[in-house]
Swiss-Prot record:
Catalysed reaction equations from the record: RNA(n) + a ribonucleoside 5'-triphosphate = RNA(n+1) + diphosphate; a 5'-end (5'-triphosphoguanosine)-adenylyl-adenylyl-cytidylyl-adenosine in mRNA + 2 S-adenosyl-L-methionine = a 5'-end (N(7)-methyl 5'-triphosphoguanosine)-(2'-O-methyladenylyl)-adenylyl-cytidylyl-adenosine in mRNA + 2 S-adenosyl-L-homocysteine + H(+); a 5'-end (5'-triphosphoguanosine)-adenylyl-adenylyl-cytidylyl-adenosine in mRNA + S-adenosyl-L-methionine = a 5'-end (5'-triphosphoguanosine)-(2'-O-methyladenylyl)-adenylyl-cytidylyl-adenosine in mRNA + S-adenosyl-L-homocysteine + H(+); a 5'-end triphospho-adenylyl-adenylyl-cytidylyl-adenosine in mRNA + GDP + H(+) = a 5'-end (5'-triphosphoguanosine)-adenylyl-adenylyl-cytidylyl-adenosine in mRNA + diphosphate
Function text: RNA-directed RNA polymerase that catalyzes the transcription of viral mRNAs, their capping and polyadenylation. The template is composed of the viral RNA tightly encapsidated by the nucleoprotein (N). The viral polymerase binds to the genomic RNA at the 3' leader promoter, and transcribes subsequently all viral mRNAs with a decreasing efficiency. The first gene is the most transcribed, and the last the least transcribed. The viral phosphoprotein acts as a processivity factor. Capping is concomitant with initiation of mRNA transcription.
Localization, UniProt: Virion; Host cytoplasm
Organism expressing this protein natively: Maize mosaic virus (isolate Maize/United States/Reed/2005) (MMV)
Protein name: RNA-directed RNA polymerase L
Amino acid sequence: MDPDYPDLDPESLDVLNSLQEGYDEEEEEDSGVSLNGMGDYHLKSALRSYTDMMKHPIFKKEFSKAVINFGISHDSMMSQIETMFYILKSTPLSMHLGTLYGDLFTRQSTLGHSEDVFDIIQAEIRTLHPHLLLEMTPAKVEEMVLIADRKTYDERAASAFWSTLITIKNYIPAWTEKGACTLDWPSVSLDKKSGYVKVMAGKDTTIYIGTDICVIEKYPTVKWAPLSYLLNGADKVAERLNVRYYSCLCDQLDIPDRITLDMLDEIIKVGDDCLREMGNDGYNVIGSYEALLAGIIQRRDNQGLIPDRDLLWRTTMEEFTSSPGRKYLEEWSTMFSSLSPEQIACAHGLYRIWGHPIVDILGGIKKMQEVASVKKNPRQSVLDEIRRQFKEMFFTSYHRIHKHYPLHTILNSLDNSYILNCLKDNLTINTSAISYNFQDWDCVMVEKNFEVPFSWNLVHNLKDKAISPNRQEIYQTISTRGTIFGSQNRRGILKSLTMETVQLRDFLQGINDNGLDDIDKIIGVYPKERELKIKARLFSLMSFRLRLYCVSTEALLGDKILKYFPQITMSLDMLTMIKKMFKVSSQTTREDDSVTVIFNLDFIKWNLQMRRNICEPVFSQLGKLFGMENLFNRTHETFRDSLIYLCSGEGVLSADPVYGVFPDGTWAWAGDESGKEGLRQKGWTILTVVTIMLIAKRHNVDVSLMGGGDNQVLGITISGVTRDLQGELITESASLARRTIKQFTEDLLTTFSDLGLPLKASETWVSDSLFMYNKHMFYKGIPLRSPLKAISRIFPLANDTIMTIDNMINNISSGVKAACMKERHGIPLVFMKTLAYRKVAEGALILHPLTTCFRTPTLPENGTVTRDGRKRSVKVTRNQLRSFFTLCMVGSSTMGLPGTIHLPDMIMRGFPDPLTSHLSFISELVPKIMDPRLASIIATSGHMSINRMTEYAKLVEDPVSINHDAPTHGLNEIRQLSRDFLMNTTLAANTHLKSLFTLLDRQREKEFYDALCSAEELDVKVLHEVAGASLFGYTNGIASRIDQTRTVRALNETVNVMKRLADAEARYIAYLFARDIHKHDLIPDQCSRVTADRYRYYSWKKKVLGVTVPHPIEMCQVTSATQTAFEDAVICWSDNLSGSRIYTTMGLGKIYQGSYTKERFKATDIAAAYGNEDILTKAVRLQKLINWRYDEGSSFARIIQLALRAITDASTDGFHRXKEEIKGEFDHRRGISGDISGGIPNFLVTPTSHXSCTTSSWISHSRGGKNENIHFQSVLINLLYRAMVYRGSLPGLPEMVWYSKERCSHCIIDIVEPSPERTTPALSEMPSAPNNPFAFIESVNVKLDYHHQVEIEKGMEETNLLNSEWGGSSLTSVDEAGLVLFLMLIGSRQVSESFLLLMREKIEPRPLLQAALNRVILVRKLGLDRLFPIRNTKCINLILGSDRGITACHDGFGLELHGGSWEKGIECDTSFLYNDTHLKPCKLHVNLHLQNVPLQLALAHASYNPDVCECLECRAIIEDRVSKRMVGQYKSWRCQYHAVLSFSPIIMRVHSERIIKSEGAIYEGDLHVPYVEEIIALENSQKLAIDVTSWRLPLLMHATWESILPQLYITMKACLVSLPLEGVIVDDDLALINLVSKVLVDLRRTIQVYIRAGTFSGSEINNKYDNIRLLPEDLRDSIHILTTTDKPDPAATVQLAADDTSPLDCAVYHLIWGDTWGMTRKVHGRILIPSSRVTTGFAGVMVTDYYATVAVLELAGAVNLWEKKLIDLEHRNNLDVPLSMNRVLAGSRLGTRGIRWAQWTSPAGLEIVVRKVRAKLSSISGNPGNAAKWRRNCQKVLKALMISLYAHSGEDMMRNASGLVKVNIHGTLSSVTAVCDPSAESRVQRAQFLFLKEKAPNGPFIXRSRLERRINLLSVVSDLLG
């Protein structure tokens, strides 16, 4: 577990590391040891020249031996390029026995059962892709594999040859010790004279390979290459094999937007040709490959927007103007210019496929010295601004997080300073306020706010990192040995073992005061590995204490400071990082009145440019925050005073008694204060980010920044632009944006130049489409597919670890999972990983990397298994080969088998139970296997036998484990050996550390774990935490950091130790052969969840609680349909897009990115403070379980407290919450420590935006129900993935609905709370070491950060206020829900949409809204609305989004609807929130668990005595207390006249969910429809007439629905009674749907109802299915979501009887509106339902006809016209749809999103419009942002109003309207055209244009082109609100 990310598992950390700067494939090199290649399978060091290598004594010695034995010379050495091409093109591949490849091939071909691979592949693919049943057969899979094998034969054979040779090379130490070769291959022998392995490669080719040199004899020539060149070439052939094989598979699978094999070969050939011609210099061209490809994508940007879209491409090409390399760049450019961005991105990851250059180490040193020698004189004005900007960012962010400002001192008090007044009164600083003066920050000085934790000591940053000897040590080494190499002085671990105890608090204080001792001021530099730069990029090794200083201070920044700079991504978890990349990249696709572009900044040697005077403005502030002003400023002083030397051995170094190494100016030098790679990344990043935000401030643009090190990507958003109807920027706006971008770019270059951190102008590029961050590419907001880089690095063998079969298969699994993250789906990866697993299994038998060191490869003869509690030796034969291979391809490490990964787990991260995952996968896989014998073998992999020993330590360390009979092997073996070494080591001179290591005693540890698991039932997740919090867990954590190190392994790994490991591995392989010969102890049930519980119960002999979770592939059945019906299932509704476009376009749905499960309550303030201490972290976190998992005072709670008492003398009181403050189920919310808790998709999630999912429809298991063992994230991921791949593979599909229904009735069970009587272990004490500073901390030594002090004081103050307990007061759920809703309205609390729906289901809407409204009004009456304005009203819409809510609140508050739909919810007129007459007498309570306690207290005062609101003195007192967030002495918050000392409101502390969820669901009863309550009144409904020849429309007042709905009720009822209707189509309008439902209920009829659903709402919930739940149960099955491709016949007809008296006989075509059915009942005819409608009313065209069938009635929203109108026959050819008489302007292009105007022709109607404007403006003013943004938003709303006025105005309407809203408009509206376009694609629009041209040439209008306007706000928003 990484201390920076304690909550992430290693797998997630691997992915996160690939995202973060400085972590991408970096490895440290340990001096010259890397050259001997011992145990290495891949290149890990930079490639050196012959001259540099000869400076290493080890290599020089080996070369001298090779000269004698083989006659080699410098001239016969192959370059690294020659070596690579020899491996790629000239590998001797003889198939004859007695040659290496022939021996290998012969042995592989005898193993057999290769056909099983094909069967397993097809079956695994079909587990999630059953639609591929006919395409994926074993024969088809075999055909595809054979094609891929044939096309990649050369690479496959060469890779196999060289990996075999390298593996044999690694046997040399063991074979030399043994004196013989253990391999019985005729082609391999040990040459005892030279010590080399002799390999017969071909008829005339012999290869001799040693630890450092490989000699190739092909008569008559002798060539040789250093081993590093060989490793480089072997890596490249393996990488090319992987990518070519994968591309070939993708070709056959027809993966869209792929790089085909032919394309790939062309790309690789260009690079190869370049290297052949240019040699090592060709890597300069190869190094430009990435920039070229990014430049090609950038060239596709909008030329009218981006000032120089060719910049990156052009500068890349110009760099090689006079170089032969240019032609190769041109070839690539031509090649890629015709490819899609997805294809380019995929090829982008191939930049290392051509190998690596020979580095110029001296050139790298000179370049480093050249940059470092530049004197920096940054402009003082820039430094001053940076200092101010740092304070602004830190103070505002600190206040946002903690609600108070950091400790500071005002140096010079200024009158009327906005900043100083805000700091004084603790008010939020708005940097856009008019009175904000940036220079006032000079008057503010930060004080100490953060402490260095006392328990930070030697072990806090203990890692296996190479270090430099100090000056004295290196002086002695050079003087005595003539070399700088000495392992004891170069490993940090050994230093830690031998050093005295160091408390970092004192250590850092000493550095702050006096600096570092001179003896420690030394830095070694070495060339970074696997780079493409010829001039070496140098990394640094520091002395132990210098490293301790740098690492500790960086850790302080990471732990304490970075959270206040959210722009920095270095400390973000994986999911947050991914979401932020999506957010920043997607801004480029916005089509509103703004435009966003992406800047990629490229600094020139960012680290080396840093100096003390550059960093001082930030570093001095950082130091002051820790009370040590010089702490960070010492960085560059220390660098300046340090001796810097080349530590990799190539330099000529001489000893110096002062410096350690004589500073000759070439290989060693001093006086260099420049920054060094990787030593102060976080500090320098903060400086860079502060400077960028300073520049952004000057240009008034919004900035989204992602920064880590020198990799800075920022999106700048320019507002105030105008777009045409196609969404493109008009010319003027494009010019404005170009100017802004150009000015911003120039300012970036100038400011950073003035600071001394120059940007590379030629590569600081801008794009409006391409976003790149750490190799992740997004194009127009969509992540690009790019799996090839990860594919290329899928290797079974890895450096620096023991190569067991389990490790090799895990390496494959990790690589495949990393590749899947960049891939669309896992189908081609199933091929890759299954074939790779088979190869590993073959290699383990033929040439095992470990066991062949000591024994000849043979099949095992006997294997040991356990049955019925007894060990049994089982004879094995070749007959078990098939079983062995199968276990290696489908096994699970949880079952004791090699850890393969299967498709259902490949596509997600975070599923908590690997046992049920494996068992359910096997149960799904077996039926799909074609071969019955193979199916039987696979089924047996799910069987288990029980170990005869019960080691509870294994269960506690891994709570999901089972006690199987597999033997220990591999890393488990070496882990214990290393612990034994540490316990007995004499190296540990530190007595405290040595004392800790005594806890590693096996027997003592076993006794502890046995006692911990002594209860009747095992609550194993809790036991895991208890053990982790104990000293056993703490010590094991330290040991795990040590025993994974190369250093300690080297101390252990003598040949004897390695032989023990090899023996363990041989036993394990024999076990795999023997495992399934005899019947197992336990076999699976039909349900995997039941099986897993049984396995755990019987293997551990006790019931294991809380870890078994059913997997969705067995628990749920996924089905699909093209018609939507209500189902008790998780539902996924797709849009109408299918085929490859779903991968390259963004839908309107919300992308599902998964989620981490968060705990629903926080630790106490004191627990949060103490949790900073290393020793206490786990024990303090454990205390949260009291009253959550176990009640306070219970026996188990006492053990939980005991864990804390064992390591501190602090009282355990105050470390846990009271029971009423806790919410959230433990089993769901608390993950196993170190693992992901939640679930994240592990594939490109773009296609999920084309679907809308909900779990609310799963009524049996939805929110508010029972606590069950369901992992909802995995259910959603499984459902979305299946739907996504199905739709992506089949173009032309209609919209579909996918259901994930419960399939297995046994999977889902209730989670039962544990009983302490059965789960409490018999544990009386925990290990404790009070006198050991590593293991115990006294409370007096715990110093709290300032914000913790404030929070604890505040918490104590609030605790003193408590006077009530939940259950002991009259508090109702309505009161509490009203408080929550109020806090949401003012933006103080965020609540999920699903919880709001739960509130809606449990609490009556009217009293709930009243409870919130009371508080809103009292805030206004107290004058606190300036501090707490209404910020967000979306919660109102969601709470009232039911027929009950609409009806109740319309009657109660006069609430008006702007609209309402099932998918998007309702949209209310929220102006009622500003009506003070709604206030009702009440007495408000206070909940200390919620936010804004001072405000709650103030409202309680006002509610108990309304006179307080009228008293100016009371209001002034209250405002002062609330603004300062005071809570003490709250009873005296009134003036003397109104003071009441007995004032005592209900004050409690309780989690709101406990109150709200305790309520039962509201009984819905009859269906409610607004305005349709009294049936009798309906017959008298007024019908409105209209003259369509005039544009004077009827007045639709606020009672619009009161007129319409009754008429629709009558119409609908009459139709159902009179006509044989088959179905009803209803617009997605909440009131109309409920009306139809009510009619059906009243008539007791069922009929198919089709709801015309719109586009996805993009919310986290799926509203329509929540609304289906509200319908009467017998109607649910009749409701269908109507999609655009699933309509009833548009020409559906209705049978009508003839009647000569019909008023419609005089015409053939009639325009019908909703109330005319009664008049047309006797007319022959049919109703034409338009295929595309422009009306918002129920309308159709009646065609009088004597041919008729059954009709479908269509009912739509917002009916405006109610009489029939005969249609002139001459228009009928253009009139296939009714005309729209709706004059509401389409204002979306004008920025009026969310506003719908009512129609009006009088001042009375205008008042409705104004009320809506007021509501919109109040929402804007409630969340204003900066002043400019607020002004722009107001102008948008008012602009839309003005346009509406202009179009509707008659006579003096414009003047009246202007006066009413106090807005003047100057200028004119120009280029205004009619709404209907004669050239439009839509026939409807063309028909309307003809009609309007004839009937109404002057209206209606919409702005189509540029809009010239000047809108002046003559009053503030509060005036507009009346």
